[in-house]
Structure formats: structure tokens, C-alpha cells
Design a protein with these regions (language model features):
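ATP-dependent carboxylate/acyl-activation modules
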Residues: 1-141
């Protein structure tokens, strides 16, 4: 009603509603395909911190549970998942699960050149991909 009053010429075809995501820690999870080594997985500080902190770890896909845990432990973002000062602990197991599944997706699908989930919001239970970007073979970066 208010739209019609404010902008009578506006044409609204539909509305897309999304639930508000709870506060959580933001990390980046991704993959880039190296011509020599194949799928290279990435984990680190996400959101706006990714450019400033350069807090990332890399490992070749596919990842095992132990390799995913090791990647996470190498970073400040990983240590923060355990909780730090006024930052509550977040669900590290969900991040491990995302890393492993994403690594197998990349390993089994060579047409995927890049995947970036930034941020992956890690909650006290679970994680939500807030923004995802994927580039396939042949697409320009």
C-alpha cells in the first residue's frame, strides 16, 4: 500500500523474504584450482577482516577430518572459534563439515575453478553461508 502511494508507477512482481541470521563469527571458506596441484582449499578470517588480516590457511583437496582441523588451528579465526574474551565459542564441527564437503565437491568436479563462501557465519550451533561465489572453467574471473 505504501509503495503504491509513494511510487504509483512501480511494478512489483513479488517479494523475497529471508530470515535474519543470528550473530556469529564470520570466516571465509573457499577453493581455487591450481593447474599443477588441483583443488586448493582455503580457510581464514572472513567478512571485512579477510583483506586486512591475511589470516588464511591452505591445503590440498580432498580434506580429511584431521587436515580440516589442522587448517583451522593454523589461523586466528580458528582460535577465535573456541571463544575469546567477549566473543562466544562457535560450532567448529560445522566448519570442519563444510570444509570437507566443499573439498570433495571441488575434487570430484574439475569444472569448478573457484568457490568462495564469505562470510560463512558460524553460530553456536551450525553455520550459514551468507554469500557464495563460484566460477566455472571457461568463465572470466
Amino acid at each position: 500500500k505504501r509503495v503504491k502511494e509513494a511510487k504509483p508507477e512501480a511494478c512489483i512482481d513479488g517479494v523475497h523474504l529471508q530470515s535474519q541470521i543470528a550473530q556469529g563469527q564470520e570466516v571465509i571458506v573457499g577453493m581455487v584450482r591450481d593447474p599443477q596441484f588441483g583443488a586448493l582449499m582455503m580457510f581464514g578470517s572472513g567478512g571485512v577482516e579477510v583483506e586486512g588480516l591475511k589470516d588464511v590457511a591452505f591445503a590440498l583437496a580432498p580434506l580429511t577430518q584431521a587436515e580440516a582441523e589442522k587448517m583451522i588451528r593454523k589461523t586466528w579465526a580458528g582460535r577465535k572459534l573456541k571463544g575469546f574474551r567477549n566473543i562466544p565459542a562457535a560450532d567448529e564441527e560445522s566448519v570442519i563439515d563444510v570444509l570437507i564437503k566443499l573439498s570433495w565437491l571441488a575434487f570430484e568436479n574439475e569444472s569448478i575453478e573457484e568457490i568462495e563462501i564469505n562470510p560463512l557465519r558460524v553460530l553456536s550451533t551450525g553455520a550459514v553461508a551468507v554469500d557464495v561465489r563460484m566460477r566455472l572453467k571457461g568463465e572470466k574471473p
